[in-house]
Amino acid sequence: MTTLKNDRFLRALLREPVDTTPIWMMRQAGRYLPEYRETRSKAGDFLSLCKNTEFACEVTLQPLRRYDLDAAILFSDILTIPDALGLGLYFETGEGPKFHKTVRTEQDVANLPKLNAKADLDYVMNAVSTIRSALGGQVPLIGFSGSPWTLATYMVEGGSSKEFRFTKQMMYAQPEVLHALLDHLADSVIDYLNAQIDAGAQAIQIFDSWGGALAHREYVEFSLNYMNKIIAGLQREKDGRRIPVIVFTKGGGQWLEPMITTGADALGLDWTTPLNTARNVVSGRVALQGNLDPAVLYGSAASIEKAVKAMLDDAYANGEKTGYVANLGHGITQWVDPAQPKIFVDTVHEYSAKYLG
């Protein structure tokens, strides 16, 4: 196995000493990069890009050629699981992901097949192993999945939603049906993430993108409990190293205390939760990741530097010298000038030295 040349990302997640703050960016391989757009045009469409091992590897590596990032993340989509369960994923221009089938009844849930990730999502595993090999130990590779709650919203609604009408209707009128769906999805995610780890993923992130749409009790019952189940079912060591797990609930800053109980090594934050507040809440029990507003990257070099320095000041305000990974508070947007993320990345590495040196 190739020796990892830069492991500060993994070390920070495990609250071990680091020489500088590690950084990666959610959606770092994406439409803001001209080379990504060129590769996507060769693939023909987004799904073809995900399913072609060579293209998926290429776009995963593209941001690492531009920026001094401390981790790569698998290029894929959170909706690969529902697609493999037979719902028929497709994308409509300007409308995002959609499914040919929905899951809205007890019978719909009963009809879902058991996922065999290594067979049903072999293109993802091929991409993971190919990317891991291509990285050559440069930086660790992050694998990922959507949370059961987040996946369920797409499956019940039939695509993206702002109100989650049908999912919340199921939650309050037929909670047993939703629980059955979430349990099926939790088992699927466990299988999927363990297959990614076997293929070479060195850390895992669970994207609970829509957890913040829930009230507190419902968040615990319908989202958090199933992430607990997933983390308990994951391989936590491979090739003699721990596999760190990050849980990211967008809009979940008020739930840090219960989120610690998941067994995750780190919690992701969006930009609505001050890092110094979050540090005080978690009190060194888990690492934190985040949380620059992606819109900051629309600004000038000076304004980006100012915002990044303020974020780092907050992250290290309580005197802790590790347990922190810099990131955006959500995915980078397609309208960002590719020159701006370099300012973000370089400022993190340079400025954090005053705290970690």
UniProtKB/Swiss-Prot annotation:
A GO MF term: uroporphyrinogen decarboxylase activity
Residues given in the record as substrate binding sites: R27, Q28, A29, G30, R31, D77, Y154, S209, H330
The entry's keywords: Cytoplasm, Decarboxylase, Lyase, Porphyrin biosynthesis
GO biological process entries: protoporphyrinogen IX biosynthetic process from glutamate
Keyword Protein biosynthesis: no
Catalytic activity: uroporphyrinogen III + 4 H(+) = coproporphyrinogen III + 4 CO2
Site (Transition state stabilizer): D77
InterPro entries cross-referenced by the UniProt entry: UROD/MetE-like_sf (IPR038071), Uroporphyrinogen_deCO2ase_HemE (IPR006361), Uroporphyrinogen_deCOase (IPR000257)
Pfam families assigned to the protein according to its UniProt record, in alphabetical order: URO-D
Protein EC: 4.1.1.37
Transmembrane found in the keyword field: no
CDD domains (UniProt xref): URO-D (cd00717)
A single cellular component GO annotation: cytosol
Primary location class: cytoplasm
Function description: Catalyzes the decarboxylation of four acetate groups of uroporphyrinogen-III to yield coproporphyrinogen-III.
Subunit and partners: Homodimer.
Homology family: Belongs to the uroporphyrinogen decarboxylase family.
NCBIfam families, sorted: hemE
Name by which UniProt lists this protein: Uroporphyrinogen decarboxylase
Encoding gene (name): hemE
